[in-house]
UniProtKB/Swiss-Prot annotation:
The lineage of its organism: Bacteria, Pseudomonadati, Pseudomonadota, Alphaproteobacteria, Hyphomicrobiales. The keyword Transit peptide does not apply. Signal peptide: none annotated. Phosphorylation of dTMP to form dTDP in both de novo and salvage pathways of dTTP synthesis. One of its GO terms (molecular function) is dTMP kinase activity. ATP binds at residues 10-17. This is Thymidylate kinase. One of its GO terms (cellular component) is cytosol. It catalyses: dTMP + ATP = dTDP + ADP. The keyword Transmembrane helix does not apply. It comes from Brucella canis (strain ATCC 23365 / NCTC 10854 / RM-666). Pfam families: Thymidylate_kin. It comes from the Bacteria. One of its GO terms (biological process) is dTDP biosynthetic process.
Length: 214
C-alpha cells in the first residue's frame, strides 16, 4: 500500500467529522484528492451493518457477537475501499477505525483483549493506519457538543450511554496513544476549530514532507 492512511479517533462530540473536512480541504489545496470515509460503514456492505449496529438491534446478541459484526463491516470496508485507495496512492481519512473497536467493544464491552486482537487482525489484514489522530475532550463537554450538533434528532445508542462509560472510553483512547506513540498523536479537542485544525495540518504536513509528497 503506497498511499497514506490517517484515522481520527475520539469520543462523542470530539469534532472528528469537522476536522476531517477541514484537513481534506487543506489537502485539496495542495493538489491531493483525499478519500473520506467512516466506520462503521464506508462500503455498501459495511453501511448495511452500520444500520443494524446503531439502531440497537445488535445488542441482543451480546458484546462478543456485536464485535464480530463490527469486524465484518471493517473487513468489507478495508477490502472494498481503503486498500484499493491506498494502492492508488491516495490519502485516506477515516472517521474511526480499530481504536474505536478497542475502546467501545474491548473496554466498555468487557471483551477479552486476545479475542479483540484476533478479530482485529483478521478484519484489517495488515491495513494499519500510518497516523491516528486522537481528538481528546472530557466526556461531559463532548456529549454537550454532540447534543447541540444533533438538535432535535434522536441520539444513537452510544450517545445515550452513561457519562462514566464515555469517560472510560476516553481513557481507553489515551492509553492506546500512550502505548503506540509512533502511530498516535493526541490532539486537545477542547479548543477552537481553527486551533485544532492548525495543529492537525502541521502534523500531517510534516509526514507528507518526510515522504517527499509536499
Amino acid at each position: 500500500m503506497s498511499g497514506l492512511f490517517i484515522t481520527f479517533e475520539g469520543g462523542e462530540g470530539a469534532g472528528k467529522s469537522t476536522q476531517i473536512a477541514l484537513l481534506a480541504s487543506h489537502l485539496r489545496n495542495h493538489g491531493f484528492d483525499p478519500v473520506i470515509t467512516r466506520e462503521p460503514g464506508g462500503s455498501p456492505g459495511a453501511e448495511a451493518i452500520r444500520h443494524v449496529i446503531l439502531s440497537g438491534n445488535a445488542e441482543t446478541y451480546g458484546p462478543a457477537m456485536e464485535a464480530l459484526l463490527f469486524a465484518a463491516a471493517r473487513a468489507d470496508h478495508v477490502d472494498q475501499l481503503i486498500r484499493p485507495a491506498l494502492a492508488e496512492g491516495r490519502i485516506v481519512l477515516c472517521d474511526r477505525f480499530i481504536d474505536s473497536g478497542r475502546a467501545y467493544q474491548g473496554v466498555t464491552g468487557n471483551l477479552d483483549a486476545t479475542y479483540m486482537a484476533a478479530i482485529e487482525r483478521i478484519a484489517i489484514d495488515g491495513a494499519m493506519p500510518d497516523l491516528t489522530l486522537v481528538l481528546d475532550i472530557c466526556a461531559e463537554r463532548g456529549l454537550s457538543r454532540a447534543g447541540k450538533r444533533r438538535g432535535s434528532d434522536t441520539a444513537d445508542r452510544f450517545e445515550k450511554e452513561d457519562i462514566a462509560v464515555h469517560e472510560a472510553r476516553r481513557q481507553a483512547f489515551l492509553e492506546i496513544a500512550r502505548q503506540e506513540p509512533a502511530r498516535c498523536k493526541v490532539i486537545d479537542a477542547d479548543r477552537s476549530q481553527e486551533k485544532i485544525a492548525d495543529e492537525i495540518r502541521s502534523v500531517v504536513d510534516t509526514i507528507l514532507t518526510e515522504k517527499g509528497l509536499l
